Curated annotation (Swiss-Prot):
This is Polyketide transferase FFUJ_12241. Belongs to the polyketide transferase af380 family. The keyword Transferase applies. It comes from Gibberella fujikuroi (strain CBS 195.34 / IMI 58289 / NRRL A-6831) (Bakanae and foot rot disease fungus). Polyketide transferase; part of the gene cluster that mediates the biosynthesis of fujikurins A-D, secondary metabolites playing a role during rice infection. The polyketide synthase PKS19 acts with the trans-enoyl reductase FFUJ_12240 and the polyketide transferase FFUJ_12241 to produce fujikurins, however, the biosynthesis pathway has not been identified yet. Residues 58-298 are annotated as: Abhydrolase domain.
Length: 320
């Protein structure tokens, strides 16, 4: 393993005028870079730092970032989550990381956990660039016709890894109408100057407002670990979740090499949903089933074995 340099604070702009912030974990030499996205309503502090350090020690410059309205990043209302916008902001993160002298622009990967895994799938599906050039085009660039576009080497992302991704964010059917009613009430109130309406991120029994189920002790555990997670999410977050389906995008990830890491007994982000998404993905792709593991308990015990499989995938696909 290589010696570790200290992480440092960074910030980057987005096309829609927001400043996002994160931590850069620089490798000791020029080489691949990877952007790591946290789970739903989670700051970069949750799990991601340990993963970044692990890959940093193996010569990958890593960027952990706070999505809009979370943690240190700008954006109002706070805890107002939009998967489509988060995917767009990942594009801006790629652009920012590509300018770092430690990063080979032909070897940039995406890594996402849970909801971050969903957004990573979407961003990888949409990451194209004209004429096979990774990041640049002349000012006021105009394509005279589709015949002039060369798409042979058109993906900016060299590889992607999606870990325990949340695939279906719509929740239980019986929760649909109440969420929509609250969302319309909230919209009308905000037009009159009211503050945004919030719901708990996780209830005491581990349930989520749209009916999904998380561990009942999740929030107390995060608090004990000192991870600053706000236990609230805007009603509009769940409205947007009803309109979002990453399954419509995953077939477009190819030809970007993709790895899906799926816990065998994932209840929070059901294993069957992850496998359904994987089936729709084109080649090249690899599936790593974490035998006997649930949504997050893979981070305890044999995590080195799991991450080494991911490192092997990245080395083979990005040639480093």
């Amino acid at each position: 393993m290589s010696p570790v340099l200290p992480r440092h604070d960074i910030e980057f702009p987005t096309l829609d005028g927001i400043t996002l912030r994160g931590w850069l974990y620089p490798a000791t030499k020029r080489g691949p870079g990877m952007i790591l996205s946290p789970g739903f309503n989670m700051p970069k502090d949750a799990i991601i730092p340990d993963i970044c350090k692990w890959f940093q020690e193996r010569d990958i410059t890593c960027l952990a970032w706070d999505p809009r309205g979370i943690g240190a990043s700008d954006g109002e209302p706070r805890n107002d989550i939009d998967p489509r916008q988060e995917a767009e902001h990942l594009h801006d993160a790629v652009t920012w990381l590509s300018k770092n002298p430690l990063v080979d622009v032909t070897k940039i990967a995406l890594w996402g956990l849970c909801f971050g895994g969903n957004v990573t799938l979407a961003a990888a599906a949409l990451e194209y660039v004209l004429n096979g050039s990774p990041f640049s085009s002349p000012p006021c660039f105009v394509v005279p016709s589709w015949a002039d576009i060369d798409l042979t080497l058109s993906k900016r992302i060299a590889a992607m890894i999606s870990v325990a991704p949340l695939i279906d964010s719509t929740g239980l059917p019986e929760r649909r109408q109440p969420i929509l009613e609250l969302a319309m009430y909230d919209r009308a109130g905000r037009l009159e100057g009211d503050d945004p309406m919030y719901l708990p991120y996780v209830n005491e029994d581990g349930s989520v407002p749209n009916g999904l189920q998380l561990a009942a002790d999740m929030m107390p555990a995060l608090d004990r670990l000192g991870i600053p997670v706000e236990n609230r999410v805007t009603v509009q977050t769940y409205y947007r979740a009803l309109t979002w389906s990453v399954l419509n995008l995953v077939e477009y990830i190819a030809p970007t090499p993709a790895m899906m890491v799926t816990p065998e007994f994932d209840v929070s982000c059901p294993t069957k949903d992850q496998l359904k998404a994987y089936e729709r993905m084109g080649e090249p792709k690899e599936l790593d089933i974490l035998k006997g593991k649930g949504h997050l308990d893979w981070i305890f015990g044999d995590v080195d074995i799991i991450l080494n499989r991911q490192l092997d995938f990245l080395k083979r696909q990005m040639n480093f």
